[in-house]
């Protein structure tokens, strides 16, 4: 075992991981969104977006307009929801309030909001507005997250390739 070679491998791995982290944080700052890239997980927005599409978000708009596709998070639920703005209002403090609906859903999203909420607050609940997408690229992440053997195989492959790398 060559200590110098092992330390070099470890430092390269740290460099790759920290570079990926810094890229993600830089993208988050540029888009003003803690999650600037998301994968569509359901068919509620068909035909506009299919399950597995990768969406690119932007959250620097002061206001959302009726017809915008936004991603929002509901308290106590970790999965972001991709739906279209159906109505837009303002409260007494001039805060924008939004009502959303999936294109492929029969009704609006009020039942999803929870806790007697009838609107989303733009500043608090909206993660971002969709500005672009890549069709079906996200199926890989869906497959890995839904298949425990795929997760283990990927982790094993990455671990073995890191150990066997000579550069």
Curated annotation (Swiss-Prot):
Highest taxon of the lineage: Eukaryota
An annotated GO BP: signal peptide processing
Assigned EC number: 3.4.21.89
GO cellular component: signal peptidase complex
Cytoplasmic topology ranges: 1-12
Subcellular location(s) of the protein: Endoplasmic reticulum membrane
PANTHER family for the chain: SIGNAL PEPTIDASE COMPLEX CATALYTIC SUBUNIT SEC11
Protein name: Signal peptidase complex catalytic subunit SEC11
């Amino acid at each position: 075992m060559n200590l110098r070679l092992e330390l070099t491998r470890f430092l390269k791995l740290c460099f790759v991981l920290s570079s990926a982290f810094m890229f993600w944080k830089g993208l988050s700052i540029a888009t003003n969104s803690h999650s600037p890239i998301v994968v569509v997980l359901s068919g509620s927005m068909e035909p506009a977006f299919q399950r597995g599409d990768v969406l690119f978000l932007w959250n620097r708009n002061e206001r959302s307009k009726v017809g915008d596709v936004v991603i929002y998070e509901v308290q106590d639920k970790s999965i972001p929801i991709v739906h279209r703005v159906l109505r837009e209002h303002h409260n007494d403090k001039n805060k924008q309030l939004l009502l959303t609906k999936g294109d492929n859903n029969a009704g609006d999203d009020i039942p999803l909001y929870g806790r007697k909420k009838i609107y989303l607050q733009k500043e608090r609940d909206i993660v971002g507005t969709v500005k672009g997408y890549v069709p079906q690229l996200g199926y890989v992440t869906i497959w890995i997250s839904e298949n425990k053997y795929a997760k283990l195989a990927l982790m094993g492959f990455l671990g073995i390739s890191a150990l066997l790398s000579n550069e």
